[in-house]
């Protein structure tokens, strides 16, 4: 994400900045810690920033959004998908990434269409994973599907394999952290001959990381996950992809595009509406910007408390078993 943010800031400044003034990016690492996020929002507000951008971790983004809302600080959330970013509807927060309920329903539809009706989820305790499991259950249960929850506080990877066999699951979804315990679970399942036919999935996108291939090798492939990219990038998206690839020395993930699009949108807002925080927040539904993955425009969406881009393109993809560095598109929406 940071690479995308920084690239966009550099391009804005190379083209003259904001009405002749340079755009400054002030970075604070929240380190997946909600308390650090709240402290960072407080600090950045005191420093006089015009708006907040970023955040990958959903639970952390929720803490940041609540604080930004309380302080009257515009926050364009780049990547976090948890539906309830704020407890009450707010004018101060907008989001690029699709809501979890939207993306994970698409993933559930992919599973069901592929013939999976007995689905186990290896889940860590968190609001995000619990929400994901509920979305899957709400989609699959009316269609005759079953979601079997495996509490990873009580099971090691070997015990997970036994549970999969006992419950006759045809798919296992990794609703757990990366690299651990996700990597250890994949290794155990792949080595268990009883589970040779089971599909492993990771809707939250852990296989997107290059480290996934480094740690798992051939076992990294054929694990479908969600990513938020179109089937074909626009000319802008293709140009940004090339620049990001040079910057990162590897193919960029969709999160880098989210970072770039965040700054592209905010820069347009700042040019048109200035630096006043209230005017920035008022602009969310009034601005349309061509991003790397389509035209970005925010609106009110049922059951979503923030201004939402509805929706970014969504794919279900996996790594190709014949070439794990290459992605296969399995389903697109």
Each PLM stretch: what is its role?
Residues 1-333:
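Extracytosolic ligand-binding ectodomains
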